[in-house]
Amino acid sequence: MLCLVYLGFAARLFVASLYSDRPELSSLQRAVRLDPTNADYRNHVGRYYALVARDPATAIDPYRAAAQLNPHAARYWFDLASAYQVLGDISNQTWALEHAIQSDPATPDVAWEAANFFLVQGEDEKALHEFRVVLDNEPTMAGAAIQFCWRIHPDADILLRDVVPARPLDFYQAVGQRLACQGELP
């Protein structure tokens, strides 16, 4: 008997995964009904509303549900922040961004995306802080990050103080490697 229950449960999850791979809204909604605790399926529904139906207001609930089901996935919080941005809801966008950063505070990709959101909001200091996280954790991105930061705030003293990592040797080695690869060093 227990084996049949397990088999039924596994079959339901398998069918849900099949529905989740289809790009139609009805299939995505079926996947959510079959496996309501799967955050990915909820996020797919939100992405459908935001990107295909171009209805960011309707995307909010599925995005929020995905983020609540798995609050440690920065992607869900960024998708929610994007929907709030399109709606012009800056306070909720900032709230979602803060959760994205909390969920993954040291990953360079997360910090880079957060920095871009903050730039759009006009929050240059927060953006520079996130670029600092990028440089602290991925020195190979130093060249691109510094160029970006220079466009935001073309003041070498501020960038050295607020953006360049405390371990300058790693940073300078990464910049030197980037310049050497681009043929800008003798």
Per-range role (PLM):
Residues 2-26, 30:
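Hydrophobic alpha-helical transmembrane segments in integral membrane proteins
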Residues 34-37, 71, 105, 136-140, ...:
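Short coil turns that delineate tetratricopeptide repeat
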Residues 41, 76, 110, 141-145, ...:
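TPR alpha-solenoid repeat register
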